[in-house]
Amino acid sequence: MMRGPKTKSSQSGSTLVEFAIGASVFLLSMFCVIEFSRALWTHNALADAARRGARYAVNQPASNPPGVATTGLNVGPSLTAVRNVAVYGDPAGGTTPMVNNLTPANVNVQYTGFGVGQGTVAVSITNYQFQFVVPIVGTTISMPDYNTTLTGESAGVIP
């Protein structure tokens, strides 16, 4: 006995199943693109924070008496202000960091040879953990260190 063509009632569930599969693939792809975009934005913002801190630090003296070399990691009277500029965008500090979960403890400032001629300032952002909103890949990833080194400016002061 020959069967006739399939009726519409026997195919009614297939459209719903196809839509569910297609929508889940589309939504998964969309969330992956959003998370990857957030990670790239955070990468760029952290590099910019290191540059912002270094630009501020080169104009701040690392040693009070002229002619005394100041070299070392996390030294200088302007350390807190440099960290605040990198994190909050303001030397006085703030309550909301420019990048989520960035703290002043993530910012290292190194003065080299300040006080005698031209020194350099290196500002680095280390140990930053990027947190995903939707934990598709995982919950956090470690971002690389962001380093910026600039030559100090005399700002018209002769040591």
Where are these regions (language model features)?
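Alpha-helix C-capping/helix-to-loop hinge sites
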Residues: 33-36, 60
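Short, conserved structural patches
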Residues: 2-3, 43, 48-159
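Alpha-helical hydrophobic helix detector
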Residues: 15-34
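A broad detector of short, well-ordered amphipathic alpha-helices
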Residues: 11, 18, 35, 47-51, ...
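A cross-family signal for key residues in well-ordered alpha-helices
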Residues: 23, 38, 47
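N-terminal leader/signal peptides at the extreme start of proteins
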Residues: 1-12
